[in-house]
């Protein structure tokens, strides 16, 4: 990341980064046939995945974690996650649901 001195410039830089993130949302089977929603493609160097996961878990009333640079949420929340990520400033056009 380029060195940014002005806090306003840093905020604008983060907003531009959010709009350029290609995010993939898909389902994986967990133990005992349960489903989990996987969100990957958010740059963990630029964004606090723990904070994003915390906000998503609160809005979706589900459990989850951050592992290997991706967010894992318990249950199938694909469509809801797309809207919530868009509300957080990520471009809805670049969120791919599988």
Swiss-Prot record:
CDD domains: YciH_like
Signal peptide stretch: none
Record flagged with keyword Protein biosynthesis: yes
Keywords: Protein biosynthesis, Translation regulation
Cited Pfam families: SUI1
One of the record's GO molecular function terms: translation initiation factor activity
InterPro entries: DENR/SUI1_TIF, SUI1, SUI1_arc, SUI1_arc_bac, SUI1_dom_sf
Family: Belongs to the SUI1 family.
Protein name per Swiss-Prot or TrEMBL: Protein translation factor SUI1 homolog
Organism: Thermococcus onnurineus (strain NA1)
């Amino acid at each position: 990341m380029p060195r940014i001195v002005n806090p306003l410039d840093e905020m604008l830089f983060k907003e531009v980064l959010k709009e350029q993130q290609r995010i993939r949302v898909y389902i994986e089977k967990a133990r005992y046939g349960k489903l989990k929603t996987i969100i990957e493609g958010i740059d963990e160097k630029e964004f606090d995945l723990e904070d994003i996961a915390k906000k998503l878990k609160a809005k979706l009333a589900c459990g989850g974690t951050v592992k290997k640079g991706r967010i894992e949420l318990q249950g199938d929340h694909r469509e809801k996650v797309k809207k919530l990520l868009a509300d957080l400033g990520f471009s809805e056009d670049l969120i791919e649901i599988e």
